[in-house]
From Swiss-Prot:
Motif (DEAD box): 165-168
Chain ranges of the Helicase ATP-binding domain: 40-219
Protein name as annotated: ATP-dependent RNA helicase RhlB
Gene3D superfamilies xrefs: P-loop containing nucleotide triphosphate hydrolases (3.40.50.300)
Family: Belongs to the DEAD box helicase family. RhlB subfamily.
Region: Disordered, residue numbers: 392-428
Phosphoprotein keyword on record: no
GO cellular component, one term: cytosol
Subunit structure: Component of the RNA degradosome, which is a multiprotein complex involved in RNA processing and mRNA degradation.
InterPro entries, per database record: DEAD/DEAH_box_helicase_dom, DEAD_box_RNA_helicase, Helicase_ATP-bd, Helicase_C-like, P-loop_NTPase, RNA-helicase_DEAD-box_CS, RNA_helicase_ATP-dep_RhlB, RNA_helicase_DEAD_Q_motif
Function comment: DEAD-box RNA helicase involved in RNA degradation. Has RNA-dependent ATPase activity and unwinds double-stranded RNA.
Entry's Gene Ontology BP terms: RNA catabolic process
Catalyzed reactions: ATP + H2O = ADP + phosphate + H(+)
Native source organism of the sequence: Photorhabdus laumondii subsp. laumondii (strain DSM 15139 / CIP 105565 / TT01)
Length: 428
């Protein structure tokens, strides 16, 4: 984590429980990020917080440290039952729930508090077995949480802390009715600590905070600009016919250590994956059609560096903390202006620099004016030489073949044209 991302405030400056401080110190966390420095003064006193902060700002650690501190300093009621979690953390996606759980493991080990996961699509009985043994902190998605609650496997009457992460995304995905259903099964708002975090504190998010929080403190951490001042943005205008070759040429020139390529549909993502896999890239595919176990494995391989390129729909654009992403490619300009910000926010995180490259093709170029109006600046345009694009590229890989990214990067470029690398660079 870059030092420029941190404040002068230290975790030890706050009255956090010693076990929380010890766990943070063991992981090398001493100084707070801005969102952490603003959140902790309120949460150590048990006060509610509604925070606005983009992903990559340290908000996960802010609410985890707050939740663990609260549970350690507020003992559970003597009549609490085994199936009653003390803290509930709700996330919009399975991947984000798993990420939060992973981030919390060191705190759980240091404090002795037990955790459980509840998300759909996989592991119903495995998750249930852990819950039946009793957990202090339950992290999950709303659908599976409601399922377990209706079946009587969990009871929310003893919840002392509730966290709603990515609240705006919850609205986008239509989960707000589920959230309200779960809130109605918990103790009254003044008998629990309530934390809400969102990339935007829109009217509808504030309305939810008013309903379900006890005089929440509103805190905001805004980047210097919506797209982040450490992200270098770049825009190309390819024809539909040259779009794929331009992408592959840019990948050849940039040779990113770790990049995400976003497209607007799963079919387009599959097509991109097929071309890159055939060209020898270590590439993974992340769409809604990919089985849950495989999705988690692909994310793990990407985070560990076994995959260099992740091709994804917007299912992966929000909430996931994937470190050291150097490049983001918008193969398609998104239809939603906010998605542009969330996509390129995968890079340039935690004080690091990043590079965003967007392709404004004939199909999606009409989305550009609204995006530039939303981010309040024009995206710098670069030109390219059509004659310098890579030629003789292999045919896309058949879709039934593995998409897991096990193919090694190419060791030779004998199938390329013979143009020297420096002469193939874009102009402009």
């Amino acid at each position: 984590m870059s030092k420029t991302h941190l404040t002068e405030k230290k975790f030890s400056d706050f009255a956090l429980h010693p076990k929380v401080i010890e766990a943070l110190d063991n992981k090398g966390f001493s100084n707070c990020t801005p969102i952490q420095a603003l959140t902790l003064p309120f949460t150590v006193e048990g006060r509610d917080v509604a925070g606005q902060a983009q992903t990559g700002t340290g908000k996960t650690l802010a609410f985890l440290a707050s939740a663990f501190h609260y549970l350690l300093t507020h003992p559970a009621a003597e009549e609490r039952q085994t199936n009653q979690p003390r803290a509930l953390i709700m996330a919009p996606t399975r991947e984000l729930a798993v990420q939060i759980y992973s981030d919390a493991e060191d705190l759980a080990q240091a404090t002795g508090l037990k955790m459980g996961l509840a998300y759909g699509g996989d592991g119903y009985d495995k998750q249930l077995k852990i819950l039946e043994s009793g957990v202090d902190i339950l992290i999950g998605t709303t659908g599976r949480l409601i399922d377990y609650t209706k079946q009587g496997h969990i009871n929310l009457n003893a919840v002392q802390v509730v966290v709603l992460d990515e609240a705006d995304r919850m609205y986008d995905l239509g989960f707000i009715k589920d959230i309200r259903w779960l809130f109605r099964r918990m103790p009254p708002v003044n008998e629990r600590m309530n934390l809400l975090f969102s990339a935007t504190l829109s009217y509808r998010v504030r309305e939810l905070a008013f309903e379900q929080m006890n005089h929440a403190e509103y805190i905001e951490v805004e980047p210097l600009q919506k797209t982040g001042h450490r992200i270098r943005e770049e825009l190309f205008y390819p024809s539909n016919e040259e779009k794929m070759r331009l992408l592959q040429t840019l990948l050849e020139e940039e040779w990113p250590d770790r990049c995400i390529i976003f497209a607007n549909t799963k079919h387009r993502c599959e097509d991109i994956w097929a071309h890159l896999a055939a060209d020898g890239h270590r590439v993974g595919l992340l769409t809604g059609d990919v089985a849950q176990k495989k999705r988690l494995r692909i994310l793990e391989e990407f985070s560990n560096g076994n995959i260099d390129i992740l091709v994804a729909t917007d299912v992966a654009a929000r909430g996931l903390h994937i470190p050291l992403v150097t490049h983001v490619f918008n193969y398609d300009l998104p239809d939603d202006c906010e998605d542009y910000v969330h996509r390129i926010g995968r890079t340039g995180r935690a004080g690091e620099s990043g590079h965003s490259i967007s392709l404004a093709c004939e199909e999606y170029a009409l989305n550009l004016p609204a995006i530039e109006d939303y981010i309040q600046h024009s995206i710098p345009v670069s030109k390219y030489n059509s004659q310098a694009l890579l030629k003789d590229l292999p045919a896309p890989k058949r879709r039934y073949r593995s998409r897991s990214g096990n193919h090694q990067r190419r060791n030779n470029l004998s199938h390329r044209n013979n143009t020297p690398r420096n002469n193939r660079k874009r102009s402009g």
